[in-house]
Amino acid sequence: MSDDWDETDAAPASDWNIESFGLPTSFGSTKKTCNTGNAFNDGEGGFDEGSQSNFDDPFRSGGGGFGGRGRGGPRACFKCGDEGHMARDCPSASDSRGNRTNNRRQDNWGGGSSSKPANGEPFGFGSAFGDNQESDPFGATESSGFGFGSGSGSRGGRRNDGGRGCFKCGEEGHMSRDCPSGGGRNKGCFKCGQEGHNARDCPNPGEGSEEKKPRAPLYIPADVNEDELFVMGIEAGSNFDAYANVPANVSGAEPIQPAAESFQSMNLRPLLLENIVKAGYGCPTPVQKYTIPNVMNGRDIMACAQTGSGKTAAFLLPMLHYILDNNCPSNAFEEPAQPTGLVICPTRELAIQIMREARKFSHSSVAKCCVAYGGAAGFHQLKTIHSGCHILVATPGRLLDFLEKGKIVFSSLKYLVLDEADRMLDMGFLSSIKTVINHKTMTPTAERITLMFSATFPHEIQELASAFLNNYLFVVVGTVGAANTDVKQEVLCVPKFEKKAKLVEMCEEILISADDEKILVFVEQKRVADFVGTYLCEKKFRATTMHGDRYQAQREQALSEFRTGVHNILVATAVTARGLDIKGIGVVVNYDLPKDIDEYVHRIGRTGRLGNRGLSISFYDDETDACLTKDLVKVLSEANQTIPDWLTQKANASGHAQTYHGSGLFASSDIRSKNGGGRGWEKNQASSFLGGPSESNVDEEWD
């Protein structure tokens, strides 16, 4: 400290000019001399009366601060200020927060009021941490303070400490961590609330008060531009005529309506026929031929058809025909909403796509079609629904939310559709579906038409569905499980760390020949999607990403920009394969091969739809994809594709079992026929490989 003093500061205290401090040399009378003693001491002093000057040793113990009673010397109780005991033994009462309720002396924070007012004690500035000791002349302990004034003025900031009791309840005999009251806080795990383990060892991390992701920003989707509805659909390709040879089978009790060879022969409303032509539909697909006439005849349907076969129109057209033909009310501005038709599907993107298809077919009509899904503003969706709703397309989660809040009832429901039923069950929506079907307002089974559409219907799903279908027809169209012969398949051996460079090389080759070509890149992990998408952007490609960790607004924007050509490369996780029709996808790249061969078939089915040609390129990594070799060889062989020699060798040397055993004639069979029940007719023709089955489970929540 002495190294920083100038000459004046270093001079003896006896040579100091006290008047230069702006302080009087005496107070009161001539008999009261100024105490120029220890300015930073522990005891009584400062400018007090009757004391001798003490400035020569400003750091000596003995006096008070500048006029303040420093309360040095013997240590006093922090609570009441009395000497002779410590704060933890203070007899004065304290509450559980340490606030004194019976203090002998009233102290002002920073004000330093005196318990013995006297002349010359005008003010005081103090702190609860102001005990002036030689080691810290400016105060470092919890006795009293450094201040200006006199008397007890420097005690201005006394800290109020609690008693010896528990900090939570204020009672003695235990510590806060053992408090039986707990102050409303659970002694157990912070995540699940259970006892016996810490949060870091919690076996149920998804429960309790675990810190969750930040809340998604409020998102209100833009209104659908109806002029775009008719230009975004996939047009029939050069091989569309092959659909005429797809095998079909219909089983069930009579009467069964024969297949309709044209939309005009289905007796649909003229407005619907106009929109069908405007949408570019020339003739119905096989699933439409066999399903629409029977639905219009009032039959429940369980339809099994391959992806891209026109299932959406198969249930929307008869539903819209019924609404227009019977002039069904939309119940506008009434609460709760009472839709005539309800379509439940597993994913948000699929719900949006079905809603757009419904608006396309109902264009220029009074029919109102609405959508409800998670990730978007619920109040906005309810506002649209309550403005009038004939057909509601919804995901299970958001539908249950509206149902529990009493915003929707099913008392007027005529059509119930479960689209991609097997996928909803695979994703864990079984309990939600049961809750909807068993809701107290749901119309009885005999008074509604229930339709189920899926790529496959295993026996367990058929047994479950029989509980809420009434005298249904089982319709199976096409072979499912084989790859589309309209898709050329290429498998390249690319190690993990060479995939980026190979992808860039392939994209450059593809886009040189066709700059407007759309490329869909599949990856297995969400973080890989962002990594690959960013890498492609750095290489000056127009790429975007889509996966479950992106906000709904970002997902819809990415999909919209990919549809419209703003971006011509979409890097996505497998969820994009779930039933989406995207016009113009010419190439599908499996950057990461899936773990299940059925998902592989379904992925490559995103291209080559409705008779159009397509190309799929798969990167094979021997370290992660060896389990697929035998199945890949089988799929390529059935689709008449060229099989690389290296892949055949790896398949022969593989120790993994083959899980794919070919497509067979039909994807599913009616379990009632094995029990001797059901009547019907069967039409078998030459087999054609179109589409593929549902994909395996993924770790993303898309409801």
From Swiss-Prot:
Query: Which intervals of this chain are the motif Q motif?
Result: 261-289
User: Could you tell me in which tissues this protein is expressed?
Assistant: Expressed in ovaries and testis. Not expressed in somatic tissue of the ovaries including follicle cells, muscle and connective tissue.
ZnF segments: CCHC-type: 77-92, 166-181, 189-204
Catalytic activity, as annotated = ATP + H2O = ADP + phosphate + H(+)
Q: Which InterPro entries match?
A: DEAD/DEAH_box_helicase_dom, Ded1/Dbp1_DEADc, Helicase_ATP-bd, Helicase_C-like, P-loop_NTPase, RNA-helicase_DEAD-box_CS, RNA_helicase_DEAD_Q_motif, Znf_CCHC
One Pfam entry for this protein is DEAD
The segments labelled Disordered in the record are: 1-22, 35-73, 88-167, 676-703
Please name the top-level EC class of this enzyme: hydrolase
Q: Where is the protein situated, by its record's location annotation?
A: Cytoplasm; Nucleus, Nucleolus
Q: Which GO terms describe its biological process?
A: oogenesis
Ranges for domain Helicase C-terminal: 506-651
- Stated role: Involved in translational control mechanisms operating in early stages of oogenesis. Required maternally in many stages of oogenesis, including cystocyte differentiation, oocyte differentiation, and specification of anterior-posterior polarity in the developing cysts. Essential for the formation and/or structural integrity of perinuclear nuage particles during germ cell formation.
PANTHER family found in the cross-reference section = ATP-DEPENDENT RNA HELICASE DBP3 (PTHR47958)
What's the protein name? Answer: Probable ATP-dependent RNA helicase vasa-like
- Species for this entry: Penaeus vannamei (Whiteleg shrimp)
